[in-house]
Design a protein with these regions (language model features):
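C-terminal accessory segments
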Residues: 110-166
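Predominantly extracellular beta-rich ligand-binding scaffolds that present long acidic/polar faces
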Residues: 1-132
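Short, compositionally biased P/S/T/A/G/V-rich stretches that sit at domain boundaries
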Residues: 152-187, 194
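Generic hydrophobic secondary-structure signal
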Residues: 6, 138, 154, 187-189
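A generic "functional-site adjacency" signal
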Residues: 87, 136-139, 185
Length: 197
């Protein structure tokens, strides 16, 4: 998603339970809040635009997100030499990289890890990418070891609005319709629906 700020300004936009691939970019004087979302390559053009990331899984270089805040996030940056910009704040975040990603952040609540497999249940190996099949669920051990500022697990399943893959609107997951109706005009239909309560 790209927003260049042109003649209008994106202010106080909220992205909740979203999966955004490629890039989420803000132009000048723009702001966005991302909650329990998976975002690839967030980018703000300068210090007049900012993001707020809460319980997100972020993939790519966060050094291009200026004047932004990160809380309870999991960050995966596959490039060495990247780090969070000094104009940002970060609390209780994990970065999956070998370098000191949080070197510009003064608090000591953030951690750098090198082992993806000890963090995610379904991690397939190699660099973390935004695959549709990836659930970003933490292992049972990681759920108790890596806690956010609110005491819940870091990442998209923690916080006040934990991600739930169950759709809020009913969705048909199975539908079998008989090829023919019976002699009295009845048609056999078998439907299964998945929805939140």
């Amino acid at each position: 998603m790209y927003y260049d700020g042109g003649s209008s300004v994106l202010k106080d936009a909220s992205f909740i339970h979203c999966r955004i691939a490629e890039e989420l970019r803000l132009g000048e004087n723009c702001s966005a809040s991302c909650v329990n979302s998976v975002i690839q390559a967030p980018y703000s053009t300068n210090s007049t635009s900012n993001f707020e990331f809460i319980n997100c899984c972020l993939i790519g270089d966060m050094g291009r997100a200026y004047s932004s805040s990160f809380k309870n996030c999991i960050i995966s940056d596959n490039e060495n030499g990247h780090y969070i910009n000094s104009s940002c704040t970060a609390y209780n975040c994990i970065c999956l990289t070998a370098n000191n990603y949080f070197r510009n952040i003064t608090n000591a609540t953030n951690k750098s890890l090198t082992e993806y497999a000890t963090l995610f249940k379904t991690y397939p190996g190699g660099p973390l990418t935004l695959l549709d099949s990836e659930t970003f669920q933490l292992t049972d051990a990681a759920k108790t070891q890596y806690l956010g500022t609110d005491g819940t697990e870091v990442g998209i399943y923690g916080g006040n609005l934990p991600f739930d893959p169950t759709p809020s609107n009913p969705q048909i997951t199975k539908c079998n319709v008989a090829a023919k109706s019976t002699a009295d005009g009845k048609l056999s239909v078998d439907i299964e629906v998945n929805a939140a309560e």
